[in-house]
């Protein structure tokens, strides 16, 4: 009898413990949900884990418009190089002006970063299907790899097809992309999927030469030749708006033309090679980079001549040297403001 009574009471005790534990878990879950609801609106970066986007949105086709009263801004979508990097997408900069986004180069990872920047800075124009235009400095893969993602991500929701500007060869590249993506277009338009704009996949490619290549509502974009070794043509861009002058180098060795275009610029975005890192490479790679890219000392001399208000280093090759070393190398010669860009920086 005593054994039965003991077993009965022990069973009741275990059940009670389970009920208490379940209640505690439910309360904890509710508190966590309430906490997350308060801290992270849809699409915002999760505060506890900045790499997690808590609510990717399917933007409406005619969604919110970027505030046209904002001053001219540049968002760094890619500060990296051809070398895969978990922290840096390949080269890409986004100009935000009068409610539109204009991309300059579109290396691998740039479009995912554009989506992050759209929500981080509340810039609807950076949602991929809202980006109107892209300007390419040259056709190396680390400057063009995300062109297909830009043109074809949710293409059916574009109001208009993408406008692309760049050097000779761009038209052939966009035709090849259209052929590559033809099965996707056929599958989406051949069934019952709603396609608000069945021609939204079309890319209008303009092969440019030196001079003004785009003007709209006070925005002037000028292309100029740069010296990227045997890659010809290769362009830099000078952007002029009512409130800013911005110069983008693209890939280039020291360029007198670029130095002239950058005189008095508000911001000069320039590629750079760390001399400390380059010294450890083979003579063949040293010869190549000296002929096609700008070393830190040459960039400092260019900045000393042009005197931009702000020099932003992007597309930096460090070759094992600490990243800040290249900043020190520039500052040893030029005493102006120097910033080493990171992905999603905004200026």
Residue ranges and their predicted role:
Residues 8-9, 138-143, 228-230, 270, ...:
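Histidine (H) residue identity feature
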Residues 8-9, 21, 33, 44:
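Low-complexity, intrinsically disordered or signal/transmembrane-proximal segments
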Residues 12-23:
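Bacterial N-terminal signal peptides
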Residues 26-246, 325-347:
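Binuclear metal-dependent hydrolase catalytic cores
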Residues 236, 243-245, 253-345:
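Cap/insert and terminal regions of metallo-dependent hydrolase folds
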């Amino acid at each position: 009898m005593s054994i039965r009574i003991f077993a009965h009471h022990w069973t009741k005790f275990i059940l009670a413990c389970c009920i208490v534990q379940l209640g505690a878990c439910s309360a904890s879950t509710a508190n966590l949900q309430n906490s997350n609801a308060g801290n992270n609106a849809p699409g915002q970066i999760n505060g506890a884990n900045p790499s997690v986007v808590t609510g990717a949105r399917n933007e409406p086709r005619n969604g919110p418009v970027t505030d046209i009263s904002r001053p001219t801004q540049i968002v760094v979508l890619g500060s990296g190089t051809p070398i895969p990097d978990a922290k840096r997408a390949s080269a890409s900069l986004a100009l935000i002006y009068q409610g539109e986004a204009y991309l300059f180069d579109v290396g691998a990872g740039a479009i995912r970063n554009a989506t992050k920047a759209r929500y981080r800075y509340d810039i609807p124009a950076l949602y991929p299907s809202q980006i109107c235009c892209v300007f390419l400095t040259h056709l190396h893969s680390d400057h063009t790899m995300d062109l297909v993602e830009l043109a074809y991500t949710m293409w059916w929701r574009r109001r208009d097809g993408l406008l692309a500007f760049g050097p000779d060869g761009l038209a052939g590249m966009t035709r090849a992309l259209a052929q590559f993506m033809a099965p996707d277009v056929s599958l989406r338009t051949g069934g019952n999927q709603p396609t608000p704009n069945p021609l939204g996949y079309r890319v209008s490619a303009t092969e440019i030469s030196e001079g003004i290549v785009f003007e709209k509502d006070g925005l002037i974009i000028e292309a100029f030749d740069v010296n990227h070794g045997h890659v010809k043509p290769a362009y830099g861009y000078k952007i002029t708006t009512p409130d800013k002058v911005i110069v983008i180098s693209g890939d280039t060795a020291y360029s007198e033309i670029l130095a002239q275009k950058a005189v008095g610029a508000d911001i000069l975005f320039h590629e750079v090679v760390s001399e400390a890192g380059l010294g450890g490479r083979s003579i063949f790679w040293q010869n190549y980079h000296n002929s096609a890219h700008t070393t830190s000392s040459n960039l400092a001399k260019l900045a000393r001549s042009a005197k931009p208000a702000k020099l932003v280093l992007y597309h930096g090759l460090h070759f094992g040297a600490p990243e800040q070393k290249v900043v020190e190398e520039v500052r040893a010669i030029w005493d102006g403001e120097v910033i080493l860009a990171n992905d999603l920086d905004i200026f």
